[in-house]
């Protein structure tokens, strides 16, 4: 077994973030007598995604991201009389209820754990929120550690973040480590900067970029144990595996 130190992203790799996000938005909007329409939801996604990209590129701070996303949304919609920072705090609290996992996350982690792999979660999320979600997910018995960017002072894809993580994993060896995640810009790019192999969870059948060294590509966590435990390089993907 070449890889026995498995580094897994949280959102949209292990955890169903779109579901958690939607439920949290609906609840928070409802608490303020507002309705989350599909168009408002889409607008928020655009604003939030753009801010997270800026955060990954060190163009803004985490505090700026969290304090401005709803301010931008309300300003665009012409909504007044709501404290956007307080609204964000309420949203993060509600987001903490989102413990639904991705398909085959439980089975995958259990298989790898029972085979002797050491599993670690690497996430850019907000620490208190992520830990609540993970604690309620049922996944934590399989993991040896969780590294949240907020607690390290760095974020994926920065090499400093991975250096922080690697220094805290006993007997860490880059040759034995595999980074698994859905995000090309944070997980796969981060693995490149850190000098570890990467497995891309390609959930939406995207074309892989030529500039990133992706060792493996999967469309479902169901396929990950075959790569790690049996050295599979490729396999037939069935529609029901996603």
Where are each of the predicted segments found?
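A short acidic, amphipathic alpha-helical/loop segment
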Residues: 104-108
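Short glycine/serine/threonine/alanine-rich loop segments
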Residues: 34, 117, 196
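Asp-based, Mg2+/Mn2+-dependent phosphohydrolase catalytic module
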Residues: 1-6, 19, 110-113, 126-242
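N-terminal helical cap/lid subdomain that shapes the substrate entry/recognition surface
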Residues: 2-103, 113
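Short, conserved structural micro-motifs that define repeat-unit consensus positions
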Residues: 113-119
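Conserved phosphate-coupling serine/threonine residues in phosphotransfer and NTP-handling enzymes
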Residues: 123
